[in-house]
Amino acid sequence: MAQKGNIGVTTENIFPVIKKFLYSDHDIFLREMVSNAVDATQKLKTLAAQGDFKGEIGDTTVRVSLDEKAGTLTISDHGIGMTEEEIDKYINQIAFSGVTDFLDKYKENANAIIGHFGLGFYSSFMVASKVEIITKSYKEGSKAVKWSCDGSPAFEIEDADKAERGSGIILHIADDCKEFLQKNKIEELLNKYCKFMAVPVAFGKKTEWKDGKNVETDEDNIINNVEPLWTKAPSTLKDEDYKKFYHTLYPMQDDPLFWIHLNVDFPFNLTGILYFPRIKSSIDMQRNKIQLYCNQVFVTDQVEGIVPEFLTLLHGVIDSPDIPLNVSRSYLQSDSNVKKISTYITKKVADRLNSIFKENRKEFEEKWDDLKIFINYGMLSQEDFYERAKDFALLKDVEGKYFTFEEYKTLIKDNQTDKDGNLVYLYANNKEEQYSYIEAAKQKGYSVLLMEGQLDTPMVNMLEQKLEKSRFTRVDADIIDRLIVKEDAKKTDLSKEQSDNLTEVFRSQMPQLDKTEFFVEIQALGEQNQPVLITQNEYMRRMKAMSQFQAGMNFYGQMPDSYNIVLNSDHALVKKVLEDAEANTAETLKPILAEIKGQEARLAVLHQEQNKKKPEEITQQEKDDVHNTEKAISDEKAKRNEIISGYAKNNNIVHQLIDLALLQNGMLKGASLDAFLKRSVDMIK
């Protein structure tokens, strides 16, 4: 006779709340249903091993089946089953004890509910309008029972016709969830959540191509691997086993660099395999490629908090029964086991890298360009990893040679220490574009590092903080003699008037490039150095680069690129330009320069007079005199600049020198490059 009653829940009609309010990810129901069936099967195996079950275990396969016509999805097992009393206890009562409390506590963290309060079974009501359980306990003399519920607090229990032990859960899929009656959808979910469960899971039958079409065979379509690689002893595995498993997880990826097999049972349980993938570009820098499992049941690929942030770039699998199936972010932040796991993984990765470095440095160096992104990220984001990695992290020079931090310091300390005792690390980020600057450094006997990685800018900033009395400077940040200043610089022999004229000759002819500023300066660099150089200020360039990494630095990112045009006043061509400029403009400029000198002398007298007075004693007339004199000077200088600019405009040597400097820096393009080529041909005819 059928028994009817109400589920032990004080809130009316809890199931719509489960379905609509608590869960955004309805897919999770299938994981819960299948993992419950797997648990029931494993419990039977345990009872048999302990001698508490004497019968035949028989077929342990968990089966998932669809009936599109009936609108049902069924999950069945041959596990321990349930008696009527157990259904009442575990389905009607325990699952909803304290339901009001958990609704209040977990409404902000919906995914933390299922499992935490035994709600795994009731997740089925996220997709089903009615659920039926037909079950028979393994216990001798047990009767089969059918339980059914339509989503209200009311349920019904009645006798059932079932000969074999185990349970079958029949989900009558709701009208708004019909996608869960599609074979492809169920295959997708089973592959996501169940592909490594510890008991065989079958979904339909295997097919074969016959008579021009796919036809079903009698063989079960087992969707999972019950003994994934991480559950096996590392000593029994070969490299090919690890690579094959990697490609099972990530079919389209290249072979990994190497891997770490995790296996610890105290003070927490943790197994897994972490792979170092080959990252070829920023496009490949994808997090959330590590899959978290609990007893071979997929939990999530959002592993922040479990795996240190820098290792979220790794691929692989972590399995720990100490992390529940349904984890919340707050849980991860507070749980002591999770913190221990994170620390353990960091240590394990550092130890593995260190062992490769010590045992086979050649192999380590060969893989460094691929490993660098992981190690640098770790050193930047985690102090304890920096301390572990500083002895095996490498620096690479432009010749392709590798050095530890200490080795490189020893290499350069004698020749690359400036007059203030600072060790100067020169680096380039593009060997081709910065070739001439690199060569200039080599001619001085300097070593140049190659820092072309995605994280090298923040690494440079960090190393300047970590390495005592050290600074990093890009080779094109200044002229070579000022990159490592060993003595006071030689001053130019030009007068102020000559410097002003020469500066204006070149300043007036600089190209107008979008978001780019040029500042002209004059240095005495020696007759053998280049006539014109372009350098980029190290601080501003680095701040612009850092704006891509740090919030709050957008100000620098919006600023124009700033370059210095350095004129070598010792070079014959620069001297010739100045001489020609003076010869061609002297007569025209003579009265203007005289006027400027006269007005500047007058301005000096006016300032001298005002300096004798308090601000409030200075009359408006005196203020106007200063303003008018300053304006007169400005007007005369504008006239001077216009005359010099007119001369420079028609001076091919000026244009050629500027374009050569731009060309050297990869900044001469389009119409400007075409004009340079034509001018070059004309000048050598």
Where does each model-flagged region fall?
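GHKL (Bergerat-fold) ATPase N-terminal catalytic module, capturing the glycine-rich phosphate-binding loop
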Residues: 1-175, 179-180, 188, 195, ...
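GHKL/Bergerat-fold ATPase module in large chromosome/replication-associated machines
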Residues: 113, 131-154, 174-178, 184-685
